Amino acid sequence: MLTTELNTTDVPAVFSRFVSVIDDKHWMSQVKLCNEEIRGNRLLDRYLHSEYAIAYQLSQMTELTRRYGSIPRQYCQDAAIYPAIGFAVQVLSAVEGFGRVDGELFRRRVHGAFKNPADMRGLRLELSVATHFIRRGDHVTWPETTGVGNFDLFIEGLGKDGLEIECKSISDDKGRNIHLRESLDFFGVLKPQIESTIAGL
């Protein structure tokens, strides 16, 4: 069901298919929003690039495609794009494997993941776990497409009744009372006032 291997020579074709299935407006608009936030608070730069890494990598590929008509071969060798192109090929194989109705539901889930880093982490974790079991030769189903169960993945043939998997991703902020984003926003407001105070000393 999921593609588990990809050759770098396939990157331009995979990206082109991904754009046609998912539409680059979803990551381009998110990157635009992030860049506007960064202009307002430079302290958010590293944080937002990390939280929206897949969107930023895909936006670079979109820009290259617009400039050159396709992703240049030397850029396909850049390991910095591997997480995004790996995500793209997995999403494509999942959408194609689900059928029309379930594929559309999955597409919408991908659209939402570009707007919410926690959703993106969860989706990538599910795809990673599914890839592990598929490479072992197991058959994986998403209960959200079958309407049976409220777990994330079902591995048929493991144990007596199969294996239900619930994927949980944890961010650096999990369990903290004050999250990094809130701290950076606060420091962004505070920084100009501190700088003006220091300048007067």
Spans of features found by a protein language model:
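Metal-dependent nuclease catalytic core centered on acidic motifs
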Residues: M1-R46, Q60-E96, I170-L201
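Nucleic-acid endo/exonuclease domains
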Residues: L44-R67, G112-A113, A118-T131
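Long, hydrophobic/aromatic-enriched structural stretches that serve as scaffold segments
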Residues: A88-L105, D119-L123, S128-V129
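Acidic-basic catalytic patches of nuclease active cores, encompassing PD-(D/E)XK
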Residues: R107-W142, L190-G200
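Conserved catalytic cores of phosphodiester-cleaving nucleases, focusing on short active-site segments
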Residues: F133, L153-I155, D161-S169
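A short acidic/basic microdomain associated with nuclease active sites
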Residues: R135-E156
